[in-house]
A protein has these predicted regions:
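Phosphate- and other anionic-substrate recognition elements at nucleic-acid/protein interfaces
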Residues: 2-8, 15-139
Length: 139
């Protein structure tokens, strides 16, 4: 029996990682949670466990580009982290240009949530779902 695999979306940051998942059909991205970063080893372990639990075979990660199109300052750290996650979880890694994903996430949240504190708690995972949905819409 062929079990459908999900895709995971990540919005990588220095302090937090936003997490989203696709439905099993691969059409719709949904925010899941925000990982408050501790250290890289624990972060990789947590995400690997989540990947196995949710039956994920592809991880879509936002790669920070500057508006000029050049890789942003944090891009190298994102790529290093992605390589370690790929080794640990044995998944395919896909990078998506994440320019303006946080701005779009903030705009979406402003429409429904007035409290900045509540929006801040959800921002990274909503941004991860936008990154993942961008990929799903192009495949």
């Amino acid at each position: 029996m062929n079990v459908s695999k999900r895709l995971m979306g990540l919005d990588f940051g220095k302090a937090r990682i936003g997490i989203a998942f696709s439905d099993i059909m691969g059409f719709l991205a949904t925010p899941h949670s925000t990982l408050k970063r501790t250290n890289e080893e624990d972060d990789i372990k947590y995400l690997t466990n989540l990947i196995n639990e949710k039956n994920v075979d592809t991880v879509v990660i936002g790669l920070p580009f500057e508006m000029s199109g050049n890789k942003g300052e944090i891009a190298n750290a994102v790529e290093e982290f992605a390589n370690k996650l790929k080794e640990s979880a044995n998944v395919k890694i896909v990078f998506v240009d994440e320019r303006l994903s946080s701005v779009e996430a903030e705009e979406q949240l402003k429409q429904t949530i007035k409290s900045w504190e509540k929006r801040k708690q959800l921002l990274d995972q909503v941004s991860a779902s936008i990154i993942l949905q961008t990929y799903l819409d192009t495949k």
